[in-house]
Amino acid sequence: MPIGVPKVPFRIPGEEDASWIDVYNRLYRDRLLFLGQDVDDEIANQLIGIMIYLNGENQSKDMYMYINSPGGAVLAGISVYDAMQFVVPDVHTICMGLAASMGSFILTGGEISKRLALPHARVMIHQPASSFYEGQAGECMIEAEEVLKLKDCVTKVYMQRTGKPMAVISEDMERDVFMSAKEAQAYGIVDLVATDDEPSTNTPFDYGRKW
């Protein structure tokens, strides 16, 4: 039987008794964000809202986004990426499990030098796909033009964030390209790979201990 989202005690400053809140809300208070599902408008709006709130609350403390996502909607992913660049604090990105498609796009949007992959994480890049399969020819042409614009946008971001030539990015995105954590580091999508003998990035609650 599913147990739902675990709850943990949290005491609001100034109050004597702790209340029970879900674990994600507790971690948000320590500027830890989670993308653990398909990228869609709902999760994108949640992440953007949290980042904007935390930005207004304290612009000197970094944020940490943990990613385990197969990807999803292109515009939703781009909106999260743009918000990460908009907020003043640095946003660390940490890949756990899989960061594919828009998941890898968001992963590479973390502050350069502060993008981390766990040792057995996987990363995948490919070009944006159209979801418009039926309709008038004119509508298909309009959508095809939009997909090409989105592909150009995504390719340019990967180029800027990885340092790879645009021709290399464009060629690699023509198909699904899977990478290990070390391969993603060599490609420039992440900067660090956590290992047993290296500390990861420092985060609240001693999340910076050795993995």
UniProtKB/Swiss-Prot annotation:
It is found in: Plastid, Chloroplast stroma. InterPro entries: ClpP, ClpP/crotonase-like_dom_sf, ClpP/TepA, ClpP_His_AS, ClpP_Ser_AS. It comes from the Eukaryota. Its EC number is 3.4.21.92. One of its GO terms (molecular function) is serine-type endopeptidase activity. Component of the chloroplastic Clp protease core complex. HAMAP family: ClpP (MF_00444). Belongs to the peptidase S14 family. Cleaves peptides in various proteins in a process that requires ATP hydrolysis. Has a chymotrypsin-like activity. Plays a major role in the degradation of misfolded proteins. This is ATP-dependent Clp protease proteolytic subunit.
